[in-house]
From Swiss-Prot:
This is ATP-dependent zinc metalloprotease FTSH 12, chloroplastic. GO terms for cellular component: chloroplast; chloroplast envelope; chloroplast inner membrane; chloroplast thylakoid membrane; mitochondrion; plastid; Ycf2/FtsHi complex. Zn(2+) binds at residues 769, 773, 849. It comes from Arabidopsis thaliana. SMART domains: AAA.
Length: 1008
């Protein structure tokens, strides 16, 4: 915008051209001509056009007063003054104005250059970049999508993003009025909900809250106003009196009830009073909007403030402190502040309990707080003492005994001091102390263990270093002393073993007596001998006998010593064989070898090392033992014993390591008699001792069991006050062991009391039932040995008969078809005897007999000896090839009831035939039992009377009584068939084959 102004020149002033030419020299600082004030203006806002006549200028051109000269003089004076001021400034402060002007001019030149370059770039952008950009964005280039390059794809994403952003901004702009309206509405609603009604009750609540914020908890202030007569009147409405009493605050509902129950107040007065108290409950009672309520609040608070000021001038106050509340409030504040610091200060104080801290007076402590010299304070648990830590100075820590000051915590918080609480009774301090001491404890433990390890290592090194020196001293603990000939013979007589034991003993004695005859011919003799068998059969006794017989060194150990000893098992194995080789020829005996050579020994690292050391010693390789295989030093025989040979590792028992296997089984009847003689030697035996009569009751006994039997018989004889051991003592011990296993052992007096409490009819029924079993058992020529029968054993209302299998049946290890049939017949004896004596009114006391009969009948049906179903697969095994033997020495293997055997799939006809065969066996044996008892009724009655009189009868007594009664015996069901080689007659021939063809037909119950 340009404005043209025409004016007439003042005749007192020279021409404007000259004035303008000299005007650029005004100022305190002198600038170069090219950087004058007029040169810096690019665009003038005002243009002034002036015109003057030439006469005006020429009229004053001669000498005399002139305004131009005056202006020039003033300008020159100003320039000189500016130069002097600049020189003085430069002299005083070192500021050079000319240098500063040069720098400013240089900066201005740079700015002009930058502006010029920017103008050039802007022109280039308008003339080149914009047209090329418009050409690049033409539709002809965009519609050919196949020829798009990466720039065009990126530009598409940028355009899309810009479009979305623009849409979002447009949407925000469109929604801005609505959002602003909602914000205002929300603000209005919030303020409406925030500012309550200015009722007296709300005013009272507000005053209480302000009082609680301004004063500590527990402080109560009572006000007394001075009346005109000079007396003090208690003002109960003062807020300081009940500000902390929450229960005094009356709820709106209770106020309504109080006003409503008052009959002296009229209805209108009640409404007005409710409105004044703010409990009217009507929604329309709100005093305007929140702005009006806020104004009302301000007016009411001003009135309350003015009223308080007026009352306070003529009032007196009484201050009361509830010390319990003050302490409780202080504790809550300290605990709340402590939770932020995590108890680090208190932990530091508790760890440095031993440090001396001087006491600081409480007033000095407050001064230190005011001067911000305190860094942290730690309250004790009883809030009576402070541990103060200063920011600087010496000492840094003090102890302050504090009173119960309600303003103390506020003062501490205002000072910005760290607060903590020392809780000595809480366990987490001890845990933190323990964690702090744990590294030191671990270091001490590591040093101790290192010292122990070094000590153990040095001991092992010394042991290996001086092994040769101490071997012989240790060898005395392993090598049994060699006895003379008489001792050897006596030891030989004490050993009662059968089989190939003595043949093996002779073979070993021949080798150990002259091993050179084998070494000269490069013959490797037996390396290891494995003794196996049930416990107590004499395996260890055989090893001792071998040592006694040979008179050679005998190194012995138990398998448990290699796993439970302090020395490693591998070292002990190497030590044993080293001692044996130094004293070769010698024996090495290890009992319970399965402890170190079992199948699972390799799973344990310690047992695996022991096992590998044993294998290396048995192999006898020179690289491992240092001794050639064919050397006299290798004349060592390894003997081991175990009760479980099937549990040994296969690598251990292979040939070359274990070359001989010897099974030492249970002794037979003859050997048991001999063992009884060995163990009863030196004891006082009565003349009636005949162990041969009781040998059938010791089937399955080992040598150790017989030794225990003799010892128990001796103890019983001493208990009875006898000096000799009688036959009855041995019988009593056998009965005691049997009845203890059944849990029915009683003393004689207790047994008599129990028998007297049972009725005669009950005893007679039990006697008849048991006599039936006894009679049928003795009618078979080769039935099990009958030990004894007893009524009411242990006081129970039952009877028991004890039978032992015969020796030949036990030796053969299997049962026969006839044996099972005999067992069924004898099992029928109890119920059949009741039917013979009492008729068909049979009791249910034979439940166990029926179960046994059914089980045996099923075994007979599925037995291969069955005439009709012997070749039919009626059962199948699950997961097992061989079934183990039955426990308790039973000869009948109940395969049907075995958990790993299940019935095979049968057709309807085979199932029916199975049932018929089962029933047939039961009925046939029952018929045999009934016929035998009817034919031998006199024997049945005799045995019944004996049981009623004595309550006990032995098998020998039954045999003696039956000899004179001419019993009708059964045929022998288990008599073996014997062939006489001298008899030239043909073998007996049966027209009826053992296996009849199966008669399969549909049963009536299964026909359709």
């Amino acid at each position: 915008m340009e404005i043209a102004i025409s004016y007439k020149p003042n005749p007192l002033i020279s021409s404007s051209t000259q004035l303008l030419k000299r005007s650029k020299s005004f100022g305190l600082v002198r600038f170069p001509a090219k950087y004058g004030l007029g040169a810096t203006r690019k665009k003038q806002l005002f243009r002034v056009y002036a015109s003057e006549s030439s006469s005006g200028s020429s009229s004053n051109s001669d000498g005399g007063f002139s305004w131009v000269r005056l202006a020039q003089s003033i300008r020159l004076g100003a320039e000189r003054i500016g130069e002097k001021i600049g020189e003085s400034v430069k002299t005083e402060i070192g500021f050079d104005s000319e240098e500063a002007s040069g720098r400013v001019n240089e900066y201005v030149a740079r700015v002009k250059d930058s502006v010029h370059k920017g103008h050039h770039e802007l022109t280039r952008f308008k003339n080149e970049t914009v047209p090329s950009f418009i050409d690049w964005n033409k539709w002809e280039h965009w519609k050919d999508i196949r020829n798009w390059d990466g720039k065009r794809v990126a530009a598409l994403f940028i355009y899309a993003f810009a479009l979305l952003l623009s849409c979002q901004r447009v949407y925000v702009a469109i929604q801005a009025p609505r959002v602003e309206r909602e914000r205002r509405e929300l603000t209005e609603s919030f303020m409406e909900a925030l500012i309550p009604e200015p009722s007296p009750g709300n005013i009272e609540k507000f005053k209480r809250n302000m009082w609680r914020k301004a004063t500590p908890k527990g402080l109560k202030l009572k006000r007394f106003i001075e009346a005109p007569d000079g007396t003090l009147v208690h003002d109960s409405s003062y807020v300081g009196e009940n500000a902390w009493d929450d229960d005094l605050e009356t709820t709106e509902g209770s106020l309504k009830k109080i006003i409503g129950r008052n009959a002296r107040i009229q209805t209108e007065a009640k409404k007005k009073l409710s409105q004044d108290l703010g409990v009217s409950g009507e929604i329309g009672d709100s005093v305007g909007n929140w702005r009006e309520r806020l104004a009302t609040w301000k007016e009411m608070l001003e009135r309350e403030k003015l009223s308080e000021q007026l009352n306070s001038s003529a009032a007196k106050y009484v201050v009361e402190f509830d010390m319990k509340e003050v302490e409780k409030s202080l504790r809550e504040d300290v605990i709340g502040r402590t939770s932020e610091t995590e108890g680090t200060r208190a932990l530091w104080i508790s760890k440095r309990w031993w440090r001396y801290r001087p006491k600081l007076p409480y007033t000095y402590f407050l001064q230190k707080l005011d001067s911000s010299e305190v860094a942290a304070v730690v309250f004790t648990e009883d809030l009576k003492r402070l541990y103060v830590t200063m920011k600087e100075g010496f000492p840094l820590e003090y102890i302050v005994d504090i009173p119960l000051d309600p303003y103390l915590f506020e003062t501490i918080c205002n000072a910005g001091v760290e607060v903590d609480l020392l809780q000595k009774r809480q366990i987490h301090y001890f845990m933190k102390v323990f964690i702090a001491l744990l590294p030191g404890i671990l270091i001490l433990w590591f040093i101790r263990e290192s010292a122990m390890l070094l000590l153990i290592t040095s001991k092992r090194f010394l042991y290996k270093k001086y092994n040769q020196l101490f071997d012989m001293a240790y060898a005395e603990n392993f090598i049994l002393p060699v006895g003379d000939v008489s001792e050897t013979k006596s030891m030989y007589k004490e050993v009662v073993l059968g089989g190939d034991v003595w043949d093996l003993l002779d073979e070993l004695m021949i080798y150990m007596g002259n091993p050179m005859q084998y070494y000269e011919k490069d013959v490797a003799f037996v390396r290891g001998v494995l003794l196996s068998g049930p416990p107590g059969t004499g395996k260890t006794l055989f090893a001792r006998t071998l040592a006694k017989e040979s008179g050679l060194p005998f190194v012995f150990a138990s398998g448990a010593e290699f796993t439970d000893s302090e020395k490693s098992g591998a070292a002990k194995i190497n030590e044993m064989f080293s001692i044996a080789r130094r004293n070769a020829p010698a024996f090495v005996f290890v009992d319970e070898i399965d402890a170190i050579a079992g199948r699972h020994a390799r799973k344990d690292p310690r047992r695996r090392a022991t096992f590998e050391a044993l294998i290396a010693q048995l192999d006898g390789e020179k690289e491992k033992t240092g001794i050639d295989r064919f050397s006299l030093r290798q004349a060592v025989i390894f003997i081991c014993a175990t009760n479980r040979p099937d549990e040994l590792d296969l690598e251990f028992v292979r040939s070359g390591r274990i070359d001989r296997r010897l099974y030492i089984g249970l002794p037979d009847a003859k050997q048991r008699v001999q063992i009884f003689g060995v163990h009863s030697a030196g004891k006082n035996l009565a003349e009636d001792i005949d162990f041969g009569k009781l040998v059938f009751r010791t089937v399955g006994f080992s040598g150790a069991d017989i030794r225990n039997l003799v010892n128990e018989a001796a103890i019983m004889s001493v208990r009875k006050g006898r000096s000799y051991i009688y036959q009855q003592d041995i019988v009593d011990v056998l009965d005691k062991q049997l009845l203890e296993g059944m849990g029915v052992l009683l003393t004689e007096e207790e047994q008599q009391k129990c028998e007297q409490s049972v009725s005669y009819e009950k005893k007679r029924l039990l006697a008849v039932h048991e006599a039936g079993h006894i009679v049928l058992a003795h009618l078979f020529p080769r039935f099990d040995w009958h030990a004894f029968s007893q009524l009411l054993p242990g006081g129970k209302e039952t009877a028991v008969s004890v039978f032992y299998p015969r020796e030949d049946m036990v030796d053969q290890g299997y049962t026969t078809f006839g044996y099972m049939k005999m067992q069924m017949v004898v099992a029928h004896g109890g119920r059949c005897a009741e039917r013979v004596v009492f008729g068909d009114n049979v009791t249910d006391g034979g439940k166990d007999d029926l179960e046994k009969i059914t089980k045996i009948a099923r075994e007979m049906v599925i037995s291969p000896q069955s005439a009709r179903l012997g070749l039919t697969q009626l059962v199948k095994k699950i997961g097992m090839v061989d079934l183990p033997d039955n426990p308790d020495g039973e000869l009948i293997k109940y395969r049907w009831d075995h958990p790993h055997v299940m019935p095979a799939e049968m057709s309807v006809e085979v199932s029916e035939l199975f049932t018929r065969e089962l029933t047939r066996y039961i009925e046939e044996t029952e018929e045999l039992a009934m016929n035998a008892l009817r034919a031998n009724r006199h024997i049945l009655d005799l045995i019944t009377r004996e049981l009623l009189e004595k309550s006990r009868i032995t098998g020998l007594e039954v045999e003696e009584k039956m000899k004179d009664l001419s019993p009708l015996m059964f045929e022998d069901f288990v008599k073996p068939f014997q062939i006489n080689p001298d008899d030239e007659e043909l073998l007996p021939h049966k027209d009826r084959v053992s296996y009849q063809p199966v008669d399969l037909r549909a049963a009536p119950l299964h026909r359709s």
